[in-house]
């Protein structure tokens, strides 16, 4: 459960990210594909080269969904319901991949905003990403 302090931390650091959704999203995906190459199986039609339009486009979608989740942080279930259905029933993404992507997102935040990603903010952002992952996998059961 996210505390009010967690929510405040997430909203504050997300404010620094909001103008870079495509850039940071693509970087997180590239990191995931490199560190966890098995995740590429969900994207067989993607050009996996650095800075490809497909990775940038999907990265923007991922970060736009996270942006929406931040804006609806008190109703993650409502904000992510459609995506939960999509990932569980149509895409059938292995839930572990959400953890992999979350780790890569934390790295991207650390690279671009090292002074803002204090231990407390890091913990809050990790809790938020875990909550998002839990919502996205809630329809798997």
UniProtKB/Swiss-Prot annotation:
Function of the molecule: Involved in oxygen transport from the lung to the various peripheral tissues.
UniProt domain Globin: residue ranges: 1-141
Residue sites binding heme b per the record: 87
Family according to the record: Belongs to the globin family.
CDD domains referenced in this protein's UniProt entry, alphabetically: Hb-alpha-like (cd08927)
One example GO MF annotation: peroxidase activity
Protein name: Hemoglobin subunit alpha
TM region(s), chain numbering: none
Subunit-structure text: Heterotetramer of two alpha chains and two beta chains.
Residues in coiled coil: none
Keyword tags: Heme, Iron, Metal-binding, Oxygen transport, Transport
Organism this protein belongs to: Caiman crocodilus (Spectacled caiman)
């Amino acid at each position: 459960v996210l505390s009010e302090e967690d929510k405040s931390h997430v909203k504050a650091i997300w404010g620094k990210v909001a103008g870079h959704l495509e850039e940071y999203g693509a970087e997180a995906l590239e990191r995931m594909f490199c560190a966890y190459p098995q995740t590429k199986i969900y994207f067989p039609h993607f050009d996996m080269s650095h800075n490809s339009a497909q990775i940038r486009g999907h990265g923007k979608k991922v970060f736009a969904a996270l942006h929406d989740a931040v804006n609806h942080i008190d109703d993650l279930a409502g904000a992510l319901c459609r995506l939960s259905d999509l990932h569980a029933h149509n895409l059938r993404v292995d839930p572990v991949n959400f953890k992999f992507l979350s780790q890569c997102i934390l790295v991207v935040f650390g690279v671009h905003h090292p002074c803002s990603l204090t231990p407390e903010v890091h913990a809050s952002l990790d809790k938020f990403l875990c909550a998002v992952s839990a919502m996205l996998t809630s329809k798997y059961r």
